[in-house]
Amino acid sequence: MDNRNPKVTDALRHDVEASWHRFLDLYEPLRPELYRYCRHLTRSPWDADDLVQDALFRAFARLGCMNEMPGNPRAWLFRIASNLWIDRVRAQKPEPEPDPQRASSREPRAVREAAGTLLSRLSPQERAAVVLKEAFNFTLEEIAEALSTTQGTVKSALHRGRGKLIEPVYQVEASPKPAVLDAFCAAFNAGDVDRLTSLLLDTAEIEVVRVHTEYGPEAARRGGFQGMLFGTRRLADPARLAGLDPAFFRNVLPQVPRVELRLHRGEWLLVHWYAHSDGDAVRAITRVEADGDRLTRVRNYFYTPDVLGEICAELQLPFRSNGYRYWKEA
């Protein structure tokens, strides 16, 4: 294959994209339940969303190598997610004995929780078995299939895990709020793309999660920031909704959304409020990483209804779903 031929590479990309959407048409109805399972395993909405997406990618790739479709799609997806998560936990190197003087809210929440609960209290298999049984009412046979093991091993894992699984309550310290976040809010709410791009490092990564990723201020100026600021003009006009499901965007007004900072479990988040004829609601959340007075990473969660719904519920904010997918024009 000549990967320098644009016609060849564009045709391949189109075929893969079309196959991916056909795959999602079939398996996406299982996504909310798969997210709940991954949420139990990872104990982080962000990590759960990543695990779900990785599991779907893995399933999509494997499907092309299988002689026949999985007989139990639900158990098959749970099995892929379980194996991915177990492999990741087992790959973590043992942490040194914790030093209280070095404990910091800067440590990733997922690492602290994995070290404190997943590794010291339960083995990965024990935790997965307990979650599948108690939260999803899987039978022993279904758990064995999902974890690629025997029913006898499942019984042992459940017996051990139930005795050890105690969910501790974590007191998370709020991370300091970088001044650049206030500057970002002010620039965004003023609709000032120049000021927004000036806050980015030259190597900054700007991502609309599960849609596209851009690098650097100029790419953000032309792409991601334009969509975040002015995409509502398209959402409010059904005739220009190519790529989006109109069912999700009823009552949207063509106004630039506003952002505000909210603290969620120790992390400062940018919450995007969209105007609707029946009241404002949150449709997106942005996470950022900063280095001094510049942003190194911007991740906009727009097509992630499970994550957005959970966080908005905890923050007691009204929420509207955008669905899971972005469809490009044919």
What are these regions (language model features)?
Residues 50:
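Conserved alpha-helix in the HATPase_c
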Residues 20-24, 32, 40-46, 54-57, ...:
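C-terminal and inter-domain tail/linker signature
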Residues 4-8, 94, 156:
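N-terminal cationic leader/targeting segments used for protein routing and processing
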Residues 78-98:
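Arg/Lys-rich amphipathic alpha helix in sigma70-family domain 2
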Residues 2-36, 46:
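A short, charge-rich alpha-helical start-of-domain segment used by transcription regulators
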